[in-house]
Regions:
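Short, flexible surface segments
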Residues: 56-60, 99, 141-142
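Residue "hotspots" at secondary-structure boundaries inside conserved domains
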Residues: 53, 95, 101, 137-138, ...
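Catalytic phosphate/metal-binding cores of nucleic-acid and nucleotide-processing enzymes, i.e., regions
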Residues: 7-22, 110-120, 131-139
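Mid-length scaffold segments of soluble, non-membrane domains
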Residues: 86-119
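Structural motif
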Residues: 45, 101-102, 109, 143-145, ...
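Protein maturation boundaries and topogenic segments
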Residues: 1-90, 160-184
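Acidic/glycine-rich C-terminal interaction modules and beta/coil loop segments
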Residues: 121-182
Length: 184
């Protein structure tokens, strides 16, 4: 008889754990919370701002990359499956350039209006895949927003590799809620 009570207690713990996870996921959806798993930005929980208004440099944004770019990220293992068109997850990045900004990619990083964002060009990613830099000498951004992995700029997959994104790709401005800074 005692074995039955032990199994019931163990099953009860699993039921409570599953209910807790379901409740946590429901609350995250209700309050527009996101969890970032990647080291590009601090790992942890973020919440989406209801009405971001005008996008500004320095804001953290959630972005569904253009389909072709996102599919490449999924294929290379940079992105997981998710809700964006093409079946990949949104990315969380810092916005470093907005329409009207002057952008130049150098060996050291991304130069925006003469401000350098450290992001050295790398030839191979951490999986040994060849990396292609976005071919930019110097451009003036028209309707493009440039993204930057501020937490781990050396290995982040950001606009230096695929260029800017349209406003329509930006899902919203998000802010950290409970995060920790971990780099690769």
């Amino acid at each position: 008889m005692r074995t039955g009570k032990i199994k019931l207690k163990q099953n009860w713990r699993w039921v409570v754990a599953v209910l807790f996870v379901i409740m946590l996921l429901a609350l995250m959806e209700i309050f527009h919370m996101r969890f970032n798993f990647t080291p590009s930005m601090p790992i942890g929980f973020y919440y989406q701002v209801a009405h971001p208004g005008i996008l500004q440099r320095g804001q953290t944004v959630e972005v569904c990359l253009p389909k072709v770019i996102g599919e490449e990220g999924l294929q290379r293992g940079y992105l997981n499956k998710g809700s964006c068109e093409g079946g990949f997850e949104p990315v969380i990045k810092e916005l470093i350039a907005i329409p009207g900004d002057e952008i130049q990619i150098t060996q050291e990083g991304i130069l925006v209006n003469q401000v350098l964002y450290y992001a050295p060009f790398i030839k191979l990613d951490m999986n040994g895949n060849a990396m292609n830099s976005y071919p930019v000498k110097k451009i003036k951004s028209t309707n493009q927003y440039w993204l930057y992995g501020a937490n781990d700029p050396e290995y982040s997959w950001d606009s230096r590799f695929y260029g800017g994104v349209d406003r329509a790709n930006i899902q919203g401005v998000i802010r950290p809620f409970l995060t920790t800074k971990i780099t690769s």
